[in-house]
Amino acid sequence: MQTNRMKLLMNMPVISKKIKQHIRQRIMDAFGGNAYEIIVGGAPLNQGIEEFLNSVGVPVTIGYGTTETAPLITFVNYDNYKVGSCGPVVAHMEAKVLSPDPEHIPGELVARGLNVMLGYYKNEEATRAVIDEDGWFHTGDLATMAPSGHFYIK
């Protein structure tokens, strides 16, 4: 039985580009050939998969939110996408990381804005536990924030 295995691949930029284009096309074809972008939310995208999709040029869009924020706090379109980030805060919202150094030290991500719930139905105690006196909704999730405004959930 003979097996032909690759022993050496000369990785010239032209070859690398063509291989990536071929892989990207195969992925897009698997989605019917008409996919514009892959939208991810509800749970983090596996880091290895995210890096792979990014490396072959598959357009990825990431969003982060909660039921209480109906539904988004952050969102990034593929043209402003940064690997590992769930994007900057969406319009009509404010968000920040409660940390002495939000860029380097994770802290709780809090948000306020038009789409934050008014409170839990008939449960003031639960509402007070998550929305402070300044109207910030406490997500309970840890994050960092880059100078660009992109958030990174930890």
Locate predicted features.
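Residue-level signal for pocket-adjacent positions within structured domains
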Residues: V40, P59, A70, Y81, ...
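Active-site glycine/GP-rich loop and adjacent strand/helix microenvironment
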Residues: G48-E50, N54-S55, L72-N77, C86-A91, ...
